Amino acid sequence: MKEWQPAIAAHKKNFVVKKNEVIFREGDPVTGIYFVYTGNVKVHKHWGDKELIIRFANNGKILGHRGLGTADATYPISATALEETKLCFIPAEFFISTLKVNHDFAFKLMMFYAAELEESEKKMRNLALMPVKGRLAVALLQLKEQFGLDENQCIAVDMSRQDLAAFAGATYETVFRTMNEMIQENLISLSGKRIAISSEATLTALITS
């Protein structure tokens, strides 16, 4: 991509969004895609009368790609900053033109799409078939894999219980109750807004049982 850096630099726009600031909303016209430099963004959509968090996008992740297509396309999801976040915006027209002539880049994006589709299908299957405790276990293990651990061995992301519930596809009340059960069973422990996994093997067993 080195030969494309001057062209990208001429078209991109870097900016910072504040915590809880909406980057784009479900149904907004597609204007381009976003790359996350630093920070954390929740990608979410309406699911009946609830909010469902599809994934989290932190350093190096991409946003808005699902909306690429025809000129009148709209974003099928929303994106909201969970903390101060630095983004790089690239207009849709330039990005699509780049894909048409850079086959290696297009292939990498296609592989990203395929992996994301597989994760989305797993999430929908879990929502339909898996009990809340299993879905919460999946959510916690995914967060650990994406964000890693801090110096206290907690998952290195500050997250509200409401967002955790939306990521697990459950109500706040159900997740609150299930987390208390997990604490009593020594599966997890809490440190402020952060969660430590005490028994990863047991959480994995909840998913596969």
Identify the residue ranges that each predicted region occupies:
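Polybasic "coupling" helices that flank or enter modular domains
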Residues: 100-169
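Residues that scaffold the ATP/ADP-binding catalytic core of kinase and kinase-like folds
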Residues: 44, 65-66, 97-98, 139, ...
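Cyclic nucleotide-binding regulatory domains
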Residues: 21-83
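Residues that recognize and position ribonucleotide moieties
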Residues: 15, 34, 55, 80, ...
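Cyclic-nucleotide recognition modules
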Residues: 3-5, 55-114, 118
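Phosphate-/nucleic-acid-contacting segments
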Residues: 143-209
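Short proline/glycine- and basic residue-enriched helix-capping loop/turn segments at helix->loop/beta transitions
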Residues: 1-19
